[in-house]
Design a protein with these regions (language model features):
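Glycine-rich phosphate/pyrophosphate-binding loop regions near the starts of catalytic domains
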Residues: 28-190
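Acidic, glycine-rich loop-and-beta core segments that form the ion-binding/anion-interacting portion
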Residues: 182-221
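Residue-level signature of catalytic and energy-coupling elements of molecular machines
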Residues: 11, 68, 181, 253, ...
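Single conserved hydrophobic/aromatic residue that forms the stacking wall/gate
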Residues: 1-16, 20
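Hydrophobic face of alpha-helices
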Residues: 23, 123-126, 197
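Active-site-proximal loop/short-helix segments
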Residues: 110, 154, 193, 200-203, ...
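Glycine-/charge-enriched secondary-structure boundary and capping motifs
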Residues: 8, 121-139, 152-159, 211, ...
Length: 348
């Protein structure tokens, strides 16, 4: 057809294409996460995943799906000009959310939106996802990028991930088996993970007057590197414990709302928990933020994970076995117990 004079579409999305297809290095890197179950390569309209091989391992398989984002941690990445860890955060945050049901993560999809596409930054972000997917045994089966200058401010990014997993129906962990006398076992975090960043930025940068490059004596590293510590992925912790035949009555991923708001999500009616806050070591980043803002302890526990990234609820007799399974993987802190209550969390 011969072009005619008139208005033409010059929007950023037109002709942008898929960044994965345009960069062979990224394409090959992403493909390296594929298991034999993945039937389509990158660039297809959809991703095909063969379920038949899984049917031999499950009597009644149930799909578990979740969606999550990195939130304003991307602002720290932008300040640091360091984007290779927020892809790890994205996969870990999503995987941990389905692990609490006992599910094994299988596939992952990502969505990256920004004001203006920078292939170098996208490559860094995806490299983190690829590393996390390889470490977790998850196939990164597809992704979407969006360039929207009318929506995002210069330099802004938004990351969203969708994960799919599988669990045997009669082994789904719901928390309904939790009983008085069960114990709470804490798995340590390494920092904020992906929650509480708006509050943390206000404390460090607005109230404390710090820059990302500053290195307060209270921290082992700079403010920026401390805040960018990647979200721990607890896939190995959960699956190895379950594969050892140990029954976990409940699992909590400690995200926004901290221990105070996440533990009640899985407690049956008539149950609460008591937690000994001295049962695990405090992290310097939380101590410093508390000091900067003169923040009450209850508010800290409601805003941050306070050093515990995941909680197992189990029988007291299983403590030793769980510690044996996780020896060399993670410390396990006996942090409290289940008591009579109204889905309340008492921290002593």
């Amino acid at each position: 057809f011969q072009a005619e004079d008139g208005i033409r579409d010059r929007s950023p999305s037109r002709g942008l294409g898929d960044v994965y297809k345009r960069q062979d290095l990224i394409k090959n890197s992403v493909s390296s996460t594929f298991t034999s179950n993945v039937l389509t390569g990158l660039g297809s309209f959809g991703s095909l995943y063969d379920l038949k091989p899984l049917l031999n391992e499950y009597d009644n398989p149930v799909m578990v799906q979740s969606i999550d984002g990195v939130g304003t941690k991307t602002i720290i990445a932008r300040k640091m000009k360091k984007y290779d860890t927020i892809g790890i955060d994205l996969l870990s945050a999503a995987a941990n959310d389905i692990l609490v049901m006992g599910a094994k993560p299988l596939t992952f999809l990502d969505y990256i939106a920004n004001d203006k596409l920078d292939p170098k930054i996208i490559k860094e972000i995806v490299s983190g996802m690829v590393k996390a997917c390889r470490d977790t045994g998850v196939s990164l089966v597809g992704g979407e990028t969006a360039e929207m200058p009318d929506t995002y401010l210069p330099g802004e990014h938004d990351l969203v991930g969708i994960i799919t997993g599988i669990v045997e129906k009669d082994k789904i962990i719901t928390g309904e088996k939790i009983r008085r006398g069960n114990v709470l076992l804490g798995l340590p975090s390494n920092g904020l993970h992906t929650n509480g960043y708006s509050f943390a930025r206000k404390l460090f940068f607005d109230v404390g007057g710090y820059d990302v490059s500053d290195h307060p004596k209270e921290l082992e590293d700079s403010v920026g590197n401390t805040l960018l510590m990647p979200h721990i992925n607890y896939t190995k912790h959960v699956l190895e414990t379950l594969n050892a035949g140990i029954e976990l009555k409940g699992i909590v991923h400690v995200t926004g709302g901290g221990l105070l708001e996440n533990i009640p999500r899985i407690l049956p009616k008539g149950h609460g928990v008591e937690i000994n806050k001295d049962a695990w070591p405090s992290l310097p980043v939380f101590d410093l933020m508390k000091s900067i803002g003169n923040i009450e302890e209850a508010e800290m526990f409601r805003s941050f994970n306070m050093g515990i990234g995941m909680v197992f609820i189990a029988e007291r007799d299983d403590i030793s076995d769980i510690r044996k399974v996780l020896n060399g993987i993670s410390p396990v802190y006996l942090m409290g117990s289940v008591v009579n209550g109204n889905k309340n969390v008492i921290i002593k």
